[in-house]
């Protein structure tokens, strides 16, 4: 009875330091999957690394709450400064799903334009869990034939795991996290754990409120060994 584990590093492309942390977490640790942000300063750098390290599964980290959209004509998605709304505004559901679909399609198409094939889709700040975006996700999953990170809601769209844990984060980043995993999971289940390893650079400090713990995450991800009965799997 093996537990199948996907350790997905979010925010590939956010900054170069983030990218290097994710690659280190893959080569020397438990990270076997990542998702790329297509509108960030480190995106091009992440693309080069994705092509170099082919053993790392790479999907698209759909963005609605950080940086600038790729499209210019998405008024419901941006504040007066032309940047995406803060997540609090998005969670109020004040975005036009049609504009979200066009912007997210542009983000996926940009990923494909580099000759990369996405393993799956997820989103920054988990906004794909918004009920008003459910149908958008269904269409994107069907169009691009990819699974999508499980949401807590019952109507998860084409989820690729039985369980999704987002608690390896901040105070939840503990030395024994992976050892204790067996107590939380039944038998043959597939589990995705969301992680955020990085090396700190000035751009990360500027763009994220979650900084110091990313280095701690990287250390634990590279020092931990999986207990017997848990294996890393690909999509």
Curated annotation (Swiss-Prot):
Q: Which cofactor does it need?
A: Mg(2+)
Q: Which GO terms describe its biological process?
A: polysaccharide catabolic process
Report the source organism. Bacillus cereus (strain 03BB102)
One Pfam family of this protein, by short name? YdjC
What protein does this entry describe?
Carbohydrate deacetylase
Function in brief:
Probably catalyzes the deacetylation of acetylated carbohydrates an important step in the degradation of oligosaccharides.
Keywords noted in UniProt: Carbohydrate metabolism, Hydrolase, Magnesium, Metal-binding
* Record has Transmembrane helix as a keyword: no
CDD domains, per this entry? YdjC_EF3048_like
Which residues of this UniProt protein bind Mg(2+)?
61, 124
Write out the similarity annotation: Belongs to the YdjC deacetylase family.
Which EC number(s) does UniProt give? 3.5.1.-
The record's InterPro entries line, in alphabetical order, gives: COD_ChbG_bac, Glyco_hydro/deAcase_b/a-brl, YdjC-like
- State a single Gene Ontology molecular function: hydrolase activity, acting on carbon-nitrogen (but not peptide) bonds, in linear amides
């Amino acid at each position: 009875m093996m537990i199948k584990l996907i350790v997905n590093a979010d925010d590939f492309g956010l900054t170069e330091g983030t990218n290097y942390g994710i690659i280190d977490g893959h080569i020397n640790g438990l990270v076997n999957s990542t998702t790329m942000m297509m509108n960030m300063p480190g995106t091009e750098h992440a693309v080069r690394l994705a092509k170099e390290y082919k053993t790392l599964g790479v999907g698209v980290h759909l963005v609605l709450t950080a940086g600038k959209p790729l499209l210019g004509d998405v008024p419901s998605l941006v504040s007066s400064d032309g940047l995406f709304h803060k997540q609090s505004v998005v969670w109020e559901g004040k975005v036009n799903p049609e504009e979200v679909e066009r912007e997210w399609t542009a983000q996926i198409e940009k990923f494909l334009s580099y000759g990369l094939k996405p393993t799956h889709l997820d989103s920054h700040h988990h906004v794909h869990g918004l009920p008003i975006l459910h149908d958008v996700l269904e269409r994107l999953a069907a169009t691009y034939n990819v699974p999508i990170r499980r949401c807590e809601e019952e109507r998860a769209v084409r989820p690729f795991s039985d369980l999704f844990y987002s608690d390896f984060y901040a105070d939840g980043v503990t030395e024994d996290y992976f050892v204790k995993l067996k107590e939380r999971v039944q038998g043959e289940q597939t589990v995705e754990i969301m992680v955020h390893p990085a090396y700190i650079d000035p751009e990360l400090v500027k763009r994220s409120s979650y900084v110091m713990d990313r280095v701690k995450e990287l250390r634990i991800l590279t020092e931990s060994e999986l207990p017997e009965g848990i294996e890393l799997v690909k999509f």
